[in-house]
């Protein structure tokens, strides 16, 4: 049963993080919680390796799939995932304000929010059965209808097909900017399982200024700053500068990707000459 308690966090980069987990175990450790892929660098987690660690140490295995749900196939039963949380507005193509969670049927979860008794109107306590136990209040039905449409389209197209296209576009962009003078790229592009993200900086220029120029002069929309991931930026040494994040979609074209890469290279030359 999952209830309340203290949570410890640890940031690690690349494969060496798996070797650190053993040392982080405490007598009170109850779960291993991992992100499917970083929203900053795109680096992915080897879920099979993480699952093996969790199972060997009798830990609950919980996955944050905000970046990977809809972008990568995830077999929760094969991996033995106990709980998986996802947002609807990213790769699942749903509206903002939608999302959900998979919870292993035999796992009891104490809800954070309660209210109402569902179809059992005369019960004086919140229902315990799933999924009602975690669905207090009125659901965002309109948003969920949009999410359902997005999921249906993804299944028709094939998640693997779309993921391969996104990975190819991210790789194309990376290959064109990685050797440009003044450009620093973060993340391990050699990973097989990663999000279609390329994060970079140009010299010591503030990432917000780079993003503004890309939008105003080139019509390219990126996200700059900390991306709600302070521990990652501490690990990368980019707390003050932030990073410029390019996120690629299967709706992008190769021409758009090449134009973006050319804009980065041109902007890097301008900044280095200032």
Predicted features along the sequence, with ranges:
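Single conserved hydrophobic/aromatic residue that forms the stacking wall/gate
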Residues: 1-8, 12-13
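Active-site phosphate-binding strand-loop segment of PLP-dependent enzymes
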Residues: 15-66, 70
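PLP-dependent enzyme catalytic core of the Aspartate aminotransferase-like
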Residues: 23, 216-217, 221, 233-274
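Active-site PLP attachment segment
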Residues: 79-123
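A short glycine-threonine-serine/GTX helix/turn-capping micro-motif
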Residues: 128-141
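Conserved PLP-dependent catalytic core of the aminotransferase class-I/II
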Residues: 142-143, 147-194, 201, 213
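Conserved C-terminal alpha-helix-loop-beta "cap" of PLP-dependent enzymes
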Residues: 178, 182-247
């Amino acid at each position: 049963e999952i209830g309340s308690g203290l949570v410890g966090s640890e940031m690690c980069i690349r494969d060496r993080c798996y070797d650190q987990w053993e040392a982080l175990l405490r007598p009170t450790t109850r779960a291993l919680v991992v992100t499917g892929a970083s929203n900053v660098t795109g680096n992915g987690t080897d879920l099979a390796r993480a699952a093996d660690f969790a199972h060997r140490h009798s830990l609950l295995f919980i996955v944050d799939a905000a970046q990977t749900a809809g972008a990568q196939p995830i077999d929760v039963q094969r991996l033995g995932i106990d709980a998986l949380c996802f947002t609807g507005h990213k790769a699942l193509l749903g509206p903002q304000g939608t999302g959900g969670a998979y919870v292993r049927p035999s796992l009891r979860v104490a809800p954070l929010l309660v209210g109402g008794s569902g179809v059992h109107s005369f019960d004086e306590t919140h229902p315990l059965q799933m999924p009602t136990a975690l669905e207090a209040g009125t659901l965002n039905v309109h948003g969920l209808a949009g999410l359902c449409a997005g999921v249906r389209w993804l299944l028709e197209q094939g998640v693997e097909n779309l993921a391969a296209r996104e990975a190819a576009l991210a790789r194309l962009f990376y290959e064109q900017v990685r050797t440009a003078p003044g450009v620093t790229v973060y993340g391990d592009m050699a990973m097989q399982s990663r999000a279609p993200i390329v994060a970079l900086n140009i010299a010591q220029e503030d990432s917000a200024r780079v993003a503004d120029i890309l939008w105003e002069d080139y019509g390219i929309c990126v996200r700059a700053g900390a991306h709600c991931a302070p521990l990652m930026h501490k690990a990368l040494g980019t707390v003050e500068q932030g990073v410029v994040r390019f996120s690629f979609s299967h709706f992008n074209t190769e021409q758009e990707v090449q134009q973006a890469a050319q804009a980065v290279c041109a902007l890097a030359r301008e900044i280095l000459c200032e």
